[in-house]
């Protein structure tokens, strides 16, 4: 697979997860959404995950490692204690 195929496959999987989450969150509400809305959320999530990956790689490199580990994630989540707690519990 090339990068474009990988990206398309990742976005397809992310689309499914975004739509599933919307269904979970909005199941009790009378709110409708369009495929265009799902696509907007997908693109936002994709960009955010890309930025997160870059930050995690930078943290690992700064620590002299070539591999991202949990300490990098905890540093990334340093301003989000609720998420840090969830990561620590798992």
From Swiss-Prot:
The keyword Translocase does not apply. It holds the Pfam family CENP-S. InterPro entries: CENP-S/Mhf1 (IPR029003), Histone-fold (IPR009072). SUPFAM superfamilies: Histone-fold. GO terms for cellular component: FANCM-MHF complex. GO terms for molecular function: chromatin binding; DNA binding; protein heterodimerization activity. Keywords: DNA damage, DNA repair, DNA-binding. The keyword DNA damage applies. One of its GO terms (biological process) is replication fork processing. Belongs to the TAF9 family. CENP-S/MHF1 subfamily. dsDNA-binding component of a FANCM-MHF complex involved in DNA damage repair and genome maintenance. FANCM-MHF promotes gene conversion at blocked replication forks, probably by reversal of the stalled fork. Component of the kinetochore, a multiprotein complex that assembles on centromeric DNA and attaches chromosomes to spindle microtubules, mediating chromosome segregation and sister chromatid segregation during meiosis and mitosis. Component of the inner kinetochore constitutive centromere-associated network (CCAN), which serves as a structural platform for outer kinetochore assembly. The MHF histone-fold complex is a heterotetramer of 2 MHF1-MHF2 heterodimers. Together with MPH1/FANCM, forms the FANCM-MHF complex. Component of the inner kinetochore constitutive centromere-associated network (CCAN) (also known as central kinetochore CTF19 complex in yeast), which is composed of at least AME1, CHL4, CNN1, CTF3, CTF19, IML3, MCM16, MCM21, MCM22, MHF1, MHF2, MIF2, NKP1, NKP2, OKP1 and WIP1. This is Inner kinetochore subunit MHF1. It comes from Saccharomyces cerevisiae (strain ATCC 204508 / S288c). The lineage of its organism: Eukaryota, Fungi, Dikarya, Ascomycota, Saccharomycotina.
């Amino acid at each position: 697979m090339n990068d474009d195929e990988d990206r398309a496959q990742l976005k397809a999987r992310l689309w499914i997860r975004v739509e599933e989450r919307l269904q979970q969150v909005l199941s009790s509400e009378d709110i409708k959404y369009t495929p265009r809305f799902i696509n907007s959320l997908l693109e936002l999530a994709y960009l955010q995950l890309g930025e997160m990956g870059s930050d995690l790689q930078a943290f690992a490199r700064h620590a002299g490692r070539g591999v991202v580990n949990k300490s990098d994630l905890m540093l990334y989540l340093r301003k989000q204690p609720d998420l840090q707690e969830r990561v620590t519990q798992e």
